[in-house]
Structure formats: structure tokens, C-alpha cells
């Protein structure tokens, strides 16, 4: 008996379904969560210099105030720590309680904490930063839950022909979130600058920071709640995925009923077949059986996500420092605080528009043609090449007149991150693990990525400091410099290329059950327990 005959009719119907309105609804509902995620995670990098000027400026100093090293590290990294925790917790919970049951929790947490972040008030600068960090941790916790849940829901709703494009489209909303963060910050800083003009710091230190600037960062952070609020109702209206209802909750009747409404077709209820194909699927995440079947793949998805995020987040969170080091953004003392915010956001918006967003959508359009494996290899190779192109002649790029080419090449590192491993590391873990462990394994892979992001955020902050003590920012020790930091990031990308080559399977055009080995379980069950080999080459016993 063939695999398709052994598969539940409801799952066959999903795999073979033509692209319909419910696919686009799912993309928008899940994608707006990622829009919010990216906006909230990356907009903080646009306002950290403003926070330093508002709360840590000494008018007697020749340079504007900046966040002390420990506070800068906390403000930039605390949301990532929360995200890591949320990915593990909600990934596990999504397999225990169901995808839909916990999907609303993450969005509510994001809404509440986005608003609360902007309401961080206290009597001292340190207390304001502590309150901000507290709410940004829990904001990150909610954001973390969106990773495994959105990826798993989209993979389980999609047909196998265009599944990669659908999951990639959800993730691509992250690019629009990054772009929106830049545009909102541009608009806010320009508007406040026009309403409350101020001189450059070197002209009048005290007057260069207007009191109204304190509203700017608060409004920017709170606006992150808006897209989440707009999609909450539709997120709650989505039915549970048929794969969870059938293969994990083992309720064939409910799965058939839900998907009959979604697909608008009659679907047979197959209680006996469900009992047959789910029999014996009780091995756990930490069992020898899981390690034999999926251990190498979990190592591959976790390791490659870790490596790409070391580079991607350090680049994203510290673009402002790189642009300052090559003199594309003027020295802080030559600007007022709102002009500095405007210039930083303009630079990051340009990078997002020209490199980040196009990369995501190249992945959407090509992933089901080229495949995940090749795109991930291409992306790691491109990031390695362009980072070496920036690092080797780095001193040349700091010379007047060369900054435009530097920014152009720098934009290509973002293009190949997003037309590459930043997107595919999100997609693959949602396709290759069993339904009852899919959300958990995606959460583990994503949390590994955030561990890399934390290393990138905290490590780059210190490592990129100049080697010359005379040019080190106040409160920091000499580091290895931006040039050597770029060499380190290029090395991470090269290792990611090798790990992809050895450990990451191709899932293009295959059903989730084929990739996870569940189809082979069904076939083995029908054949009286015979051994089979799954489509990715792992022996099934």
C-alpha cells in the first residue's frame, strides 16, 4: 500500500490543496506577529544613543552622554534573553496544549509589554533603564513564543508544493517590521526636530537636548503594540491545525470538521486509520530513538541558526556604530540629539530598503524552486565573501569618498542573510520533525539562534571597540576593532556553510510526514513493523 493511501485524507487534502484565501489569511495573521517582533527587537538600536544623551549627558563633557557599557549591553540584549526563554517555553507549550491555545498569549504579552516599555518612568536614570529592561525582557518572552508557533502553524496549514514560500512570507514580514521601525523613527525625529529645534552639542551642550526628546523614544517603543492589536481577533479565530488535532490530540473528527470548513470540501473521518498510524509514536525528545532519527538534524538546525544570528544581530543592533566608525554618520558632538536619531534611522532605513527587505522576498519567490539547502549554502557563502570584502581593505573604506561603496557592500551582507540562512533556518525546523515535537524542536533551534544573537549583541558591543585606548568610548576597554570583528563574523558564516553542508536536509516538495519519518511509521505499521528508510536518509525502525 502506498504512502498516500496510508496518510489521513485530511492531511492529503492539505498537502494537495490549491493556494486559497485561507493561506493568505494565515500569512497575514502570523506575519503581523513577525512584523511586530522585528519592530520591537530592532527599534531599540535606533534610540539607544538618544537614551544616552537624555539620561547620561554631562554638559561639562566635550562629548554627548552615552549609555554606560553595562546598561547599553542590558538595553540591547535583555529582549534577546527574554526571546530565548520564550522560544523554549512556548515551543514546548505549543506541543502540549496546541498551537492555537497558546498563540493568543504571546500576542497579548507583546501588546502589554510594548506599551509598558514606553511608560518606563522613575526618579533616576538607572531606575528608568531598569524598568525598561524589565518590560523588554517580558516583551522578548512573548516575541520568543511567536517563532515556533507561527512557523509550525504555517507549515501545518500549507500545501507541500508552496509550503516554503508560505513560511518564508510569514518570516519576510520581519523585514517590513525593521523598515517600519526606521521609517517611524525618521518621522518622529523629523517632526520633533521641526517643532523643537536645538543647536549642536558643541555649540550649546545643555540646549542640544530638548526636554520633549524624552517623548520620542517612548512613542516609538509603544507603537510596536499597534499591529499586534489589529490582528489579535483574527489570530483567535484561526482553528487548530489539523496535524496537531489528528496526530497529537488524536481527534480525527475535529480535524476533519475544521479543515472541511477551511478547504470547503467534504473530508472523511478516519478514526481507525488514525489509531493505526499513531500507534507506537510515543518516544520522547530525549530518547535514543529520537536521537537516532532526528538528532543530527536538530544539531544542524540549531547550530546553523546560532551561527547566522551571531552575525545578523551584531550587524543589525550596531549598524550605528559601524556607520560612525567609517564617518558616514557625523560625530555626535556636531549634532543635536534629534538630528543624530534622524541620521541613524535614515542610514538603517536605507540598508533595510535596499538589502534587508529584498533578500526576504527573493527567498519567498525562489525557495520552492531552488530549495532550502541551496539557498542556505548560497547565503552563508555570500555573507562570508562580502564580510571579507569589508574587512580586508577596511582602512580604505574609512577614507573620505569611499563610504558609499562600503554601505553598498554592507547592504549585500543583509541581502544574503535574508536570501539565505536568516530565512531558511526559520523554515527548515518547522518541516523536518514529528508533529508532536515540531514546535518544541523549532523552539530549541530558535533559542540556539537567540543564544548566538546574545553573543553577537553583547560581544560585538565590547569587541568592536578600537584597539587604541585614545579612541575607546567612555567606560569601555580596548577591543579588537571593527575590522577584526568583521573577520570573526565572516568566520562564523564560513562554519555555518560547513554545518549546513553536513547536517541540514532538503525538504522541498515533500510532505511534513515524509520529512519527519511519520510517513514511514505509517508504512511500517501497515507492513507489520518492517524497517523503512525515510526520505532524508535516516533509518526508521
From Swiss-Prot:
Region entry Disordered, spans: 512-541
What molecular function terms (GO) are annotated for this protein?
phosphate transmembrane transporter activity; symporter activity
User: Where does the record place Acidic residues bias?
Assistant: 515-524
Pfam families reported in the protein's UniProt record? Sugar_tr
Q: Which residues lie on this side of the membrane: Cytoplasmic?
A: 1-26, 92-100, 146-163, 235-297, 371-374, 425-443, 506-541
The SS bond pairs are none
Q: Where is the composition biased (Polar residues)?
A: 532-541
Q: Which GO terms describe its cellular component?
A: membrane
Q: Which UniProt keywords apply?
A: Membrane, Phosphate transport, Symport, Transmembrane, Transmembrane helix, Transport
PANTHER family on file = SOLUTE CARRIER FAMILY 22 MEMBER
- Family under the similarity heading: Belongs to the major facilitator superfamily. Phosphate:H(+) symporter (TC 2.A.1.9) family.
Q: What is this protein called?
A: Probable inorganic phosphate transporter 1-12
Show the taxonomic lineage. Answer: Eukaryota, Viridiplantae, Streptophyta, Embryophyta, Tracheophyta
Amino acid at each position: 500500500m502506498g504512502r498516500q493511501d496510508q496518510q489521513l485524507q485530511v492531511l492529503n487534502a492539505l498537502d494537495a490543496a490549491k493556494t486559497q484565501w485561507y493561506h493568505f489569511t494565515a500569512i497575514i495573521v502570523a506575519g503581523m506577529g513577525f512584523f511586530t517582533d522585528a519592530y520591537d527587537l530592532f527599534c531599540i538600536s535606533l534610540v539607544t544613543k538618544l537614551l544616552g544623551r537624555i539620561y547620561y549627558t554631562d554638559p561639562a563633557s566635550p562629548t554627548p552622554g552615552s549609555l554606560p557599557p553595562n546598561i547599553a549591553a542590558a538595553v540591547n540584549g535583555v529582549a534577546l534573553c527574554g526571546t530565548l526563554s520564550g522560544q523554549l517555553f512556548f515551543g514546548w507549550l505549543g506541543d502540549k496544549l496546541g498551537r492555537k491555545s497558546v498563540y493568543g498569549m504571546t500576542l497579548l504579552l507583546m501588546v502589554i509589554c510594548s506599551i509598558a516599555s514606553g511608560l518606563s518612568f522613575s526618579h533616576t536614570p538607572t531606575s528608568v533603564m531598569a524598568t525598561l529592561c524589565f518590560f523588554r525582557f517580558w516583551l522578548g518572552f512573548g516575541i520568543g513564543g511567536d517563532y515556533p508557533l507561527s512557523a509550525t502553524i504555517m507549515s501545518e496549514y500549507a500545501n507541500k508544493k508552496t509550503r516554503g514560500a508560505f513560511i518564508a512570507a510569514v518570516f519576510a514580514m520581519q523585514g517590513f517590521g525593521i523598515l517600519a521601525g526606521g521609517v517611524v523613527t525618521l518621522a518622529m525625529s523629523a517632526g520633533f526636530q521641526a517643532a523643537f529645534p536645538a543647536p549642536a552639542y558643541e555649540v550649546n551642550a545643555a540646549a542640544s537636548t530638548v526636554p520633549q526628546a524624552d517623548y520620542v523614544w517612548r512613542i516609538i517603543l509603544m507603537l510596536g503594540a499597534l499591529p499586534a492589536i489589529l490582528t489579535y481577533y483574527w489570530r483567535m479565530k484561526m482553528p487548530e491545525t489539523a496535524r496537531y488535532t489528528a496526530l497529537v490530540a488524536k481527534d480525527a473528527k475535529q480535524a476533519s470538521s475544521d479543515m472541511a470548513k477551511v478547504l470547503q470540501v467534504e473530508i472523511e473521518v478516519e478514526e481507525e486509520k488514525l489509531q493505526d498510524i499513531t500507534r507506537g509514536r510515543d518516544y520522547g525528545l530525549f530518547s535514543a530513538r529520537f536521537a537516532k532519527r532526528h538528532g543530527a538534524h536538530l544539531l544542524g538546525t540549531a547550530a546553523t541558526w546560532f551561527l547566522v544570528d551571531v552575525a545578523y544581530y551584531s550587524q543589525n543592533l550596531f549598524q550605528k556604530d559601524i556607520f560612525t566608525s567609517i564617518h558616514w554618520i557625523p560625530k555626535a558632538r556636531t549634532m543635536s540629539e534629534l538630528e543624530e536619531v534622524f541620521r541613524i534611522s535614515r542610514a538603517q532605513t536605507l540598508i533595510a530598503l535596499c538589502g534587508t527587505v529584498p533578500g526576504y522576498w527573493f527567498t519567498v519567490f525562489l525557495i520552492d524552486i531552488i530549495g532550502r539547502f541551496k539557498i542556505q549554502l548560497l547565503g552563508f557563502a555570500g555573507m562570508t565573501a562580502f564580510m571579507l570584502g569589508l574587512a580586508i581593505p577596511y582602512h580604505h573604506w574609512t577614507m573620505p569618498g569611499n563610504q558609499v561603496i562600503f554601505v553598498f557592500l554592507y547592504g549585500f551582507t543583509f541581502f544574503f542573510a535574508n536570501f539565505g540562512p536568516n530565512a531558511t533556518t526559520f523554515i527548515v525546523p518547522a518541516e523536518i520533525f514529528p508533529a508532536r515535537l515540531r514546535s518544541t524542536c523549532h523552539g530549541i533551534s530558535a533559542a540556539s539562534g537567540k543564544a548566538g544573537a546574545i553573543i553577537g549583541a553583547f560581544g560585538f558591543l565590547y569587541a568592536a571597540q578600537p584597539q587604541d585606548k585614545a579612541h575607546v568610548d567612555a567606560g569601555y576597554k580596548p577591543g579588537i576593532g571593527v575590522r577584526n570583528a568583521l573577520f570573526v563574523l565572516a568566520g562564523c558564516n564560513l562554519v555555518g556553510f560547513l554545518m549546513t553542508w553536513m547536517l541540514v536536509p532538503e525538504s522541498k516538495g515533500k510532505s511534513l510526514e515524509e520529512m519527519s519519518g511519520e510517513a514511514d511509521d505509517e508504512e511500517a505499521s501497515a507492513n507489520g513493523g518492517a524497517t523503512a528508510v525515510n526520505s532524508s536518509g535516516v533509518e526508521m525502525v
